[in-house]
Amino acid sequence: MGGGGQPRESGEPGSSPAVYTWEEVQHHSSRNDQWLVIDRKVYNISQWAKRHPGGYRVIGHYAGEDATEAFTAFHPDLKFVQKFLKPLLIGELAATEPSQDRNKNAALIQDFHTLRQQAESEGLFQARPLFFLLHLGHILLLEALALLMVWHWGTGWLQTLLCAVMLATAQSQAGWLQHDFGHLSVFKKSRWNHLVHHFVIGHLKGASANWWNHRHFQHHAKPNIFKKDPDINMVDLFVLGETQPVEYGVKKIKLMPYNHQHQYFHLIGPPLLIPVFFHYQLLKIMISHRYWLDLVWCLSFYLRYMCCYVPVYGLFGSVVLIVFTRFLESHWFVWVTQMNHLPMDINYENHNDWLSMQLQATCNVEQSLFNDWFSGHLNFQIEHHLFPTMPRHNYHLVVPRVRALCEKHEIPYQVKTLPQAFADIIRSLKNSGELWLDAYLHK
């Protein structure tokens, strides 16, 4: 219809806009040929995707699809980013085409849109700077107390253990804080969020802002979807969900004894993710992608750390201390980040609407002062995934309306205790391993 599916970067001045069907749009979903739809407007992002500030992968995951809800969720200043879309506009959907693709529930999408508008009008996307300043303050205080303790009381086993625990706590809390700035949920201006994000993740944690952005936004865009969510790419060490184990079993893939994965998870999951895998991946990505600014921020962390601890522990002792700190931090990070997603539905792309997709892949953990602090408010993972730019101190305010909307449309809204959420990680790994073994032996 109309444009006949001919790709171009923009329409000719003065010409009437070309019109397309959903079928035509869906044909443009390959790596080098990508169209998407936002508010019924059709955009050709084939060339521009490589310049997308959030990374080419995250926007490419919506090629051939309606990206309206994702576009709204990720960008706090829609008017600002609209100017980047204008040169990419190639037409619009035909009047006979529905606003939603793939038979999505229009009533559900409209109800969620209304909920978001209500939250915006009530100021729930406005941050309280003091909240984040206090979180930064308690991180810096923990680091200062850890250093003062070993400087004043020496480097005995007890002092060293307490120092490592305090440093690991500071690192974990800095991880939650960088998450806030990375999601542009603190300052009104994105540039300030980016600047402080570099400081927190780079100077306070020794990691890369670009690496985190490109990886984490994919997870939010397509949570628990194979080949799109990097958080479920387990490099064949684990099989997840109910589909992948059967696939591996039928194909007789046995790179690991997956029926025992719920046991060896304790050996290679929490202990090694940050000290080994993340450090290797960070260094590789920063060098291969030439993230030189990120590398400078990262090196500033280690320079500061060595200046503080080499005088009391020596070079070797300081290295041992930071490795042990990363070991402790890694346990904290893995259990908290996996409890909301790993036990949920994990599958291939099924093109759900935003609300349904996020709820299938996400659960909450009960609210308490400890749970809020311990998880960086990721116990409200459902609300965070629905509204990634909402400041975390407002999650609890939108919970009743999200639950009511889910109840209205019969979408399960899961809330667990913290021990139950942790136990479900192991339970889901055990269940997936058993599915693999059954398929491996009998199919």
Curated annotation (Swiss-Prot):
Domain Cytochrome b5 heme-binding residue range list: 17-94
Membrane topology field: Multi-pass membrane protein
SUPFAM superfamilies on file: Cytochrome b5-like heme/steroid binding domain
Record's catalysed reaction(s): (9Z,12Z)-octadecadienoyl-CoA + 2 Fe(II)-[cytochrome b5] + O2 + 2 H(+) = (6Z,9Z,12Z)-octadecatrienoyl-CoA + 2 Fe(III)-[cytochrome b5] + 2 H2O; (9Z,12Z,15Z)-octadecatrienoyl-CoA + 2 Fe(II)-[cytochrome b5] + O2 + 2 H(+) = (6Z,9Z,12Z,15Z)-octadecatetraenoyl-CoA + 2 Fe(III)-[cytochrome b5] + 2 H2O; (8Z,11Z,14Z,17Z)-eicosatetraenoyl-CoA + 2 Fe(II)-[cytochrome b5] + O2 + 2 H(+) = (5Z,8Z,11Z,14Z,17Z)-eicosapentaenoyl-CoA + 2 Fe(III)-[cytochrome b5] + 2 H2O; (8Z,11Z,14Z)-eicosatrienoyl-CoA + 2 Fe(II)-[cytochrome b5] + O2 + 2 H(+) = (5Z,8Z,11Z,14Z)-eicosatetraenoyl-CoA + 2 Fe(III)-[cytochrome b5] + 2 H2O
InterPro entries reported in the protein's UniProt record: Cyt_B5-like_heme/steroid-bd, Cyt_B5-like_heme/steroid_sf, FA_desaturase_dom, Fatty_acid_desaturase
SMART domains membership: Cyt-b5 (SM01117)
Single GO MF annotation: acyl-CoA 6-desaturase activity
Subcellular location: Membrane
Gene Ontology BP terms: unsaturated fatty acid biosynthetic process
UniProt keyword annotation of Lipid biosynthesis present: yes
GO cellular component: membrane
Tissue specificity as recorded in UniProt: High expression in the brain and liver and weak expression in the gill.
Transmembrane region(s): 130-150, 151-171, 267-287, 305-325
The organism's place on the tree of life at top rank: Eukaryota
Sorted UniProt keywords: Fatty acid biosynthesis, Fatty acid metabolism, Lipid biosynthesis, Lipid metabolism, Membrane, Oxidoreductase, Transmembrane, Transmembrane helix
Pathway: Lipid metabolism; polyunsaturated fatty acid biosynthesis
The protein's Enzyme Commission number: 1.14.19.3, 1.14.19.44
Role according to the record: Fatty acid desaturase with bifunctional delta-5 and delta-6 activities. Component of a lipid metabolic pathway that catalyzes the biosynthesis of polyunsaturated fatty acids (PUFA) with preference toward n-3 substrates and Delta(6)function.
Family of the protein in this entry: Belongs to the fatty acid desaturase type 1 family.
Domain notes: The protein sequence includes a number of characteristic features of microsomal fatty acid desaturases including three histidine boxes and an N-terminal cytochrome b5 domain containing the heme-binding motif.
Name of the protein in question: Acyl-CoA Delta-6 desaturase
Protein's gene: fad1
